[in-house]
Amino acid sequence: MRRIVLVGIVAGAVVAPVADALAGPRAHETACLETSGDAGNACLKSYVGAIERCRRAPDATCESAVRADGGALDEALGDTASPVMRRCADASVERLGYLDLDDLAFRIPEACADFAEDLLDIEFADDLELLAPDALRCQRNVVRSIRRLRNTVVRESGPRCFVRAFDGGACDRARRDARVSRERGLARGRILGRCGTAFDALGLASLAPVSSTLEERVDELLGVVIDRGHHFAQRVYPPNDLGPTADFGPFPVGVRTLVLADATRLNAGGTGPRPVLTEVYYPSTAAAVTGMPRDIIRVFGIPITETPSFRDVARAPGRFPLVLFSHGNGGIRFQSFFFAAHLASHGFIVATPDHHGNTFVDAALGIVDPASATNRPLDMSFLIDQFLAFDTTPGHFFEAGVDPDRIGASGHSFGGYTTFALVGGSFALGAFTDPRVKAALPQAPSALPFADDFFASITVPILILGGSIDGVTPFPANQQRPFDNLEPGAAVVGLAGLVGAGHFTFSDFCEVPRELLSFLGGFEEACEPRHLPWRHAHDIVNFLSLNFFDAVLNGDPDALARLTPGNLAAIEDLVYQSH
C-alpha cells in the first residue's frame, strides 16, 4: 500500500473563523495551529509540555508565567519557522507521539503541510497510477471530500466548542453534531455519486468487512475521518473549566505497586494464597519528584500512556484519607488512573487492586475466578486490613500514613457492584458490609444482583455516577433504581447522570491505542463522536469525586456546598438528583 497524504489546507484556515474568540490565553494554541511542518509540531509540543508541567506543579503561578509576554510559550513561537511544506523526519513523527496522538491517526513520515495534516492519510493501492481515469478522478474526489469533512470536525469540535466553553461561553453540541452530520452527508453523496464502483479500486475496502455494501464501506471511511478529527480536537483544546477542585491538586503524585496475598483465600487455581496486586497513588513532594520521569503504563509490554504520577518517590508526611477503587469486569487496577491520581493530588491515598481472575490480563492467560462476585468485596476489606497494619509497622512506607476513621470506596461497573456490597446489608450472595467504609462512590455500577430493598440498607453517604447512553449497565436499572430506593438522611445521597457518557467514559480506555482497544473492547462505549468528550467527562467525575470525599471524609463544608443541586445545575452535561 502507498500512503497519499491529504495536503493543501493549512491549519490556520481551520481556526481563522474564530480567531477573535481565541485572543488572550488561547493565542499560543492558535499560533501553533497556524504554523506548519516540523515547526508546528515543535510549537505544539512546547505548548502542551509547558502547560501540563505547570498543571502538575505545586506553584499556582506557573501557568501564568509561561503564558506571559516573553515567557516560555513566546520563546517557542519565536523559534518556529515559516509555514512551508516539507518532509517530516522521523523525529517529527515522534513529536506527534509525544503529544499522545499516535493512537488517533495513521501516522505518516512522508510529508508535513501542517501539523493537522499529520492526523490523517489514506492508504491507496500501490498501482493506483495504472488504474483507469475514472478511478483517478474518484481518488481526487475522495481526498477533497474527506479533507473538508476532517476540517469541519476539527473546527466544530475544537475552537467552536471547547475553547468557547473554556472561556466561559456555551458549546451547542447539538448544532455541532448537525453541522458535522451535514458535511458527512455531502461527502457521502459526492463519493458515491462521482465514484461508484471505482471506489473499490482505491484499495480502501479493508476499512470495512468484505461482505459489506459499497455504501457501508464509504460510511466506514467517513466514520474514521470523524473519529480522528473529533479526538484530535479533544487532545488540543482543553475541556470546560469547573474550577480548582476539577484541576490537579497541590501535591505531586507518587505511585507504587504492592505485591500482596491473602493467605485466608486460595488463588483461582487453588494452588496458593489469593494475590491482591495493588497500585497505590499517594501525595508526594516537589523535592521528591524533581528530575524524575513520569510513570508510563504498559500492558503486555506495550507502553500505553504517560500518567501524571511518579513511580516510587517519597511520600508526603502526615495522615491522609484512604479511598479504595475497584476496577470493572475484565478491567485492571490502573484502568482509571485519572481518578486515582486526581484524588492523590488533593491529599488522598488511593489503593486500586487487581481482582485476581477478573482482569483482562488474567483472561489472556486463561485465569478465571468463578467466585469473583464474592471475592471482590473481600479483596477490598483485605486491603483495609493491610493498610491499617502498615500504619503501625515501624519503617513501612505507609507507616502513620492513613487515617483509619476516614476510609471511602469507589469502583466502576462490577467495581460499582463491589462498592454497593461493601456498604449495604445482606443479599443473595451473602453479606460483605465493612463498617470501616464511611463513604461510597459507585461509577456506572452494575446493580442487577441486588433487590430494591437492599439499597434501603445503605446508611453511609453515597453518590452514584452514571452515563445516559451506557449500553453495558443501563442507567434506569443500574443507577436510577438504586437511587430511588436509597433512604435520605446521610450528608450526601445523590445521583449524578452524565449526559452522553457511555460505560467506559468512567475509565481511561480512550487513552488506549486503537489496536489494543480492539482486543479489549470498549471503544463503542466511550470513544465515539456521539459520546460526551472523555476529558470533559473526567473533569466532571473528578469534580464530583473530590468534593464528595472532601465533604464526607474531611468534613469540608465548602465541598458539601458545591454538591447542592443548585450549584450542580450550572454544570453542562450533568443531571443531578438528591434525597
Which functions belong to the PLM regions below?
Residues 21-239:
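Soluble, non-transmembrane alpha-helical interaction regions
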Residues 240-324, 335, 527-534:
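Domain-level recognition of soluble alpha/beta enzyme cores
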Residues 244, 457-538:
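Active-site-adjacent alpha-helix of alpha/beta-hydrolase-fold enzymes
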Residues 287-288, 305-363, 471-476:
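Short substrate-entry loop that stabilizes the transition state in hydrolases
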Residues 327, 411-417:
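Conserved alpha/beta-hydrolase "nucleophile elbow" surrounding the catalytic nucleophile
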Residues 345, 369-404, 409, 421:
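Alpha/beta-hydrolase active-site loop
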Residues 388, 416-431:
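Short glycine-enriched nucleophile-adjacent loop
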Residues 430-446:
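A conserved short beta-strand
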